[in-house]
C-alpha cells in the first residue's frame, strides 16, 4: 500500500467580537493589568455572547479554511472537532458542523484532548488520508472556555478566551506536508487541570453547581512545571523524528497559554524570537483553538512560506502533549 503525503491546504479562524481587557477584569475580580501581563503575557481575550455555542464558531472557521483550500462541502469526507466545550454532551459538535455545512458524505466525530486536541485531530486525519481511507478532512479546534470558568476565581478567569481554528487536510506533493508527529500523556497528572463535575463520576446536580464543580480547576505551579519540560522535549523529538534538527525550524507555533512558558521553551531550544509565533496577548489561552488560530494569523501575515519547516507544539489537561513537524506547501 502506498502511503500518501498529507498536508494542510487551507486554514481559517473565528473569534467573538467582544473584547475583555485586563482593565475590565480589574472591575470584576481582585486582580490588576500589571499582575496579569507580567505573569501570563495576556492583555485581552475574546468572549462569546450568551446565546452562542462552539459549533457557531467552528462553522465560521471551517468555511474560511475550505474557501482557502478551494474545496466544497461535497468533497469533505471526514470532520474531526477537537473541543472540551461541545454544544452539548451528545451528539458530537462535529455532527452539527457537518449538517450546517451540508457535508453529507463526511464522517464526523469529536475528540477530547484539551489544548493539544487540534494536533491530535490532525494526526488522526493524516493517518486516515495517508492510507487512502479518506481524501479530504476538516479538523477543527474550538473552545468557548468563558462558559466553563469561574468568573470569581482570579487564578483561572484571567487566562482563557474563546475562539475556533480549522484546517483542511489533503494529499500533497512528495516532500511536503506532515513529516512527523509526537503524541504523549502523563495521566497521573490528571488532577492538576480538570473539571470535576458534569460527567459520569459526578453528574451535574444542584449540589455540584453550588460547589462550583462544573468550573475549570487548575494547579497552576504543577501545570507550569510540566509545560516548561514537555514543550521543548516534544519539539526536539518531533524534528529528530523527521530527520532534522531544531536549527532547521523556520517557524515554531507553540500553544498560547503563558508567555513565560513560551519564553522558557524558546530559550532552551535556542531559537530566535522572530521564528516564534505569539498572539496570546490578544486572545489568551483558547485551548484547542490556540495553534490553528496562531497558524492562520502567521500565514495571513506572510510568516509562512512555501518550503518552510513549521513546528506546532502543545500541552494540556490530561496531562497530555503533542507536536507536529510540517514542510509547508502543496
From Swiss-Prot:
Pathway the protein acts in: Lipid metabolism; fatty acid biosynthesis
Subcellular location(s) of the protein: Cytoplasm
Active site per UniProt: 115, 255, 285
CDD domains xrefs: KAS_III
GO cellular component, one term: cytoplasm
Broad enzyme group: transferase
Keyword line: Acyltransferase, Cytoplasm, Fatty acid biosynthesis, Fatty acid metabolism, Lipid biosynthesis, Lipid metabolism, Multifunctional enzyme, Transferase
Reactions performed catalytically: malonyl-[ACP] + acetyl-CoA + H(+) = 3-oxobutanoyl-[ACP] + CO2 + CoA
Keyword Acyltransferase: yes
EC number: 2.3.1.180
Biological process, per Gene Ontology: fatty acid biosynthetic process; secondary metabolite biosynthetic process
Region ranges (ACP-binding): 256-260
Listed InterPro entries: ACP_syn_III_C, ACP_syn_III_N, FabH, Thiolase-like
Top-rank taxon, per record: Bacteria
Job of this protein: Catalyzes the condensation reaction of fatty acid synthesis by the addition to an acyl acceptor of two carbons from malonyl-ACP. Catalyzes the first condensation reaction which initiates fatty acid synthesis and may therefore play a role in governing the total rate of fatty acid production. Possesses both acetoacetyl-ACP synthase and acetyl transacylase activities. Its substrate specificity determines the biosynthesis of branched-chain and/or straight-chain of fatty acids.
Quaternary structure and interacting proteins, as annotated: Homodimer.
Domain notes: The last Arg residue of the ACP-binding site is essential for the weak association between ACP/AcpP and FabH.
Membership in a protein family: Belongs to the thiolase-like superfamily. FabH family.
Protein name: Beta-ketoacyl-[acyl-carrier-protein] synthase III
Amino acid at each position: 500500500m502506498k502511503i500518501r503525503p498529507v498536508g494542510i491546504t487551507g486554514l481559517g479562524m473565528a473569534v467573538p467580537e467582544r473584547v475583555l481587557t485586563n482593565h475590565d477584569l480589574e472591575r470584576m475580580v481582585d486582580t490588576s493589568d500589571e499582575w496579569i501581563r507580567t505573569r501570563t503575557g495576556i492583555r485581552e481575550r475574546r468572549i462569546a455572547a450568551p446565546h452562542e455555542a462552539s459549533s457557531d464558531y467552528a462553522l465560521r472557521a471551517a468555511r474560511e479554511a475550505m474557501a482557502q483550500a478551494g474545496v466544497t462541502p461535497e468533497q469533505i469526507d471526514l470532520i474531526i472537532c477537537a473541543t472540551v466545550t461541545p454544544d452539548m454532551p451528545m451528539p458530537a459538535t462535529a455532527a452539527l458542523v457537518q449538517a450546517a455545512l451540508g457535508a453529507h458524505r463526511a464522517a464526523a466525530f469529536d475528540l477530547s484532548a484539551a489544548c493539544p486536541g487540534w494536533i491530535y485531530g490532525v494526526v488522526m486525519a493524516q493517518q486516515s488520508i495517508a492510507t487512502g481511507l479518506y481524501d479530504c478532512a476538516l479538523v477543527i479546534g474550538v473552545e468557548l472556555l468563558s462558559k466553563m470558568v469561574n468568573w470569581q476565581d482570579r487564578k483561572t478567569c484571567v487566562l482563557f478566551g474563546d475562539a475556533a481554528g480549522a484546517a483542511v487536510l489533503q494529499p500533497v506533493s512528495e516532500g511536503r506536508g506532515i513529516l512527523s508527529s509526537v503524541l504523549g500523556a502523563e495521566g497521573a497528572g490528571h488532577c492538576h487541570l480538570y473539571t470535576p463535575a458534569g460527567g459520569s463520576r459526578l453528574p451535574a446536580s444542584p449540589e455540584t453547581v453550588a460547589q462550583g464543580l462544573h468550573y475549570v480547576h487548575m494547579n497552576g505551579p504543577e501545570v507550569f512545571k510540566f509545560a516548561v519540560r514537555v514543550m521543548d522535549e516534544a519539539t526536539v523529538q518531533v524534528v529528530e523524528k523527521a530527520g532534522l534538527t531544531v536549527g532547521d525550524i523556520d517557524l515554531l507555533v507553540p500553544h498560547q497559554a503563558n508567555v513565560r512558558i513560551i519564553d522558557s521553551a524558546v530559550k532552551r531550544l535556542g531559537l530566535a524570537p522572530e521564528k516564534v509565533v505569539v498572539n496570546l496577548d490578544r486572545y489568551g489561552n483558547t485551548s484547542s483553538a490556540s495553534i490553528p488560530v496562531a497558524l492562520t494569523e502567521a500565514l495571513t501575515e506572510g510568516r509562512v512560506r512555501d518550503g518552510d519547516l513549521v513546528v506546532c507544539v502543545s500541552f494540556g489537561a490530561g496531562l497530555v502533549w503533542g507536536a507536529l513537524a510540517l514542510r509547508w506547501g502543496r
